[in-house]
Amino acid sequence: MGHHRSCKNGLWKPIGVTISYLAVPFNVSFRARSFFVPNSRKMTTIRRFCCNDLLRFTSVNLDHLTETFNMSFYMTYLARWPDYFHVAEGPGNRIMGYIMGKVEGQGESWHGHVTAVTVSPEYRRQQLAKKLMNLLEDISDKIDKAYFVDLFVRASNTPAIKMYEKLGYVIYRRVLRYYSGEEDGLDMRKALSRDVEKKSIIPLKRPVTPDELEYD
């Protein structure tokens, strides 16, 4: 897998990337996506997360339901899966939200994973989370040829669960005591085009423990 990218002043330059998985090359040009948010004339840009953003996105993580990690964790994702780490940026270079994920697994378990997706409270209800999720799904589906995308969510986080269901995700299984505080997690999945028979989203009939997870 070859990545040729440039980060200057916190902005990604449009680049050409050649990615090869399963011995199949794909030539893709990754460029920032700009759009007007609903009911607003302000331009929003979704671009790759850059090293400089690590010092600027703290305010987005203030929501108590947002899982946060140490700096080395974010650095690992930025280094290993840069194509799955994007930020939504508004006027004045203000970070509105971000998504962080990866691709992993083998055989029919080859999948994209959403590790974290969050939008700052003042920018919610503008479909930013949907746009970030769609971008990760497109990369998983069209570039990495994954079978599905999955994510974990707290069983008590009803608003997030409903949002994911609207985006086409289903509850695949319950993971007992997955989160701190002994709270259960829900493993939600969305089948991609490669999973023609939708085998990846057939729900399990029993809950599992974190030790039984193949990937997390």
Features from the language model and the residues they span:
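Acetyl-CoA-dependent GNAT
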Residues: 44, 51-124, 133-144, 191-193, ...
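Conserved glycine-rich acetyl-CoA-binding loop
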Residues: 116, 120-134, 143, 148, ...
